[in-house]
């Protein structure tokens, strides 16, 4: 009987100690299997922040055509990555690390286009009787196509839970943080692995957007350019020199005018140099970093006889990035 009482007391104590604040890392998601490739593409191209066609019927029709034209190619890409996107398991590993480093909060994640969706995660947090939330965008720079889309989805999911009304705060961008940029620079230097930085053209490659999105008022291009300028300043402060430091845009889709220069253009332009690429718009590795940058563009670099071609990893579940996230949330609490 004493053993039973002891276990009941432990359960009560654990319930009392359960964190009352949760931090939800928001990202785009990625297929967790080849079966989910279709789900991922369908949800992405049905997103009005991605495919900005106001008429729902027309958007679904156009989205369906895009999905049908891309699904087999996308499946082949994910086959090369082991049959799934690395984004979800890496994000899970990051939350595991965060929960160990900061047990005062509960860290979890929600994806925009694949499970776990925000609605699923928020239902779980409601059962946990969480009192406050932080919606944490995993995109360093703000864009309506990423940050706003994720926040809109999360707030709509929260609104649907009529009896769950926690206090909500948001972290919508963090590219200007010197701490973040020091972590990025250290990642670049680690990838160089004692090679001479002055021999390398450093290309900060970010996900591209149609020019029309920027013309409509999206601040993404401005923030990416500002981010690169901050990193240039940091490089100078640390007395590190590169042959050149450049910004480029990848992943162009369709015939529309997109942001320039493209990453492919810069690789070709600097084919007689050593090149190192850092994926500046992503914090977690995904198909655009591991396939597009590290496989597809690497083959291009080899074909062009680029002297050396290096691709840096994203911040992923590194302890440095985890500590940075905790610091951002702590600073948010004191504001």
UniProtKB/Swiss-Prot annotation:
Its EC number is 4.98.1.1. GO terms for biological process: heme biosynthetic process. Pathway: Porphyrin-containing compound metabolism; protoheme biosynthesis; protoheme from protoporphyrin-IX: step 1/1. It comes from the Bacteria. PROSITE patterns: FERROCHELATASE. InterPro entries: Ferrochelatase, Ferrochelatase_AS, Ferrochelatase_C, Ferrochelatase_N. Keywords: Cytoplasm, Heme biosynthesis, Iron, Lyase, Metal-binding, Porphyrin biosynthesis. One of its GO terms (cellular component) is cytoplasm. It is found in: Cytoplasm. Fe cation binds at residues 207, 288. It holds the Pfam family Ferrochelatase. The keyword Transmembrane helix does not apply. GO terms for molecular function: ferrochelatase activity; metal ion binding. It catalyses: heme b + 2 H(+) = protoporphyrin IX + Fe(2+). Catalyzes the ferrous insertion into protoporphyrin IX. Belongs to the ferrochelatase family. HAMAP family: Ferrochelatase. This is Ferrochelatase. It comes from Helicobacter pylori (strain Shi470).
